[in-house]
């Protein structure tokens, strides 16, 4: 637990820009981040209502710049502040190849091709704190990222925070509903 940063380049090779030297602000940017928080929270299985009720916010934690060969071996993020339940990485437009991201949880893995449309668009990846993730090496160019802690600022009365188990319950419910629908409709659509 805490803000300590690992410096072993066999594990992690990336430039970290001191937050005191960076300003990321403006109404448009704040609205963009709020929109990404809402969308990524929904994709993590958190309802839009709970995003508001729990006061889910993104707090800027790091500014990272990956050069050719830059990578981060599989790891889990540590809790960096009270209420933190996940991480949001917003990739700013920059030209690079490689640097795919793998996110794994309980034996399942998803690979994200981060260099697709990287020169002209923002991309983001969000994941719960109990997910293992890695950044594969940049093969050419530079990858520029803002790393945010996903934080609950208004915990519910039970002190329960969002976690991947909520998403698992949602998937299980959807699977049960799909199976029921297939049984009653003989698999027909329409």
PLM-predicted stretches and their roles:
Residues 2-70, 76-79:
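Signature of the catalytic double-stranded beta-helix
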Residues 3, 14, 135, 168-171, ...:
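Intrinsically disordered, low-complexity regions
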Residues 32-36, 40, 84, 131, ...:
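Alpha-helical interaction elements in eukaryotic regulators
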Residues 42-53, 77, 89-90, 134-135, ...:
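Intrinsically disordered, low-complexity boundary segments flanking structured domains
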Residues 56-59, 63-159:
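Catalytic core of non-heme Fe(II) oxygenases with the double-stranded beta-helix
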Residues 153-190:
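Eukaryotic intrinsically disordered, low-complexity regulatory regions
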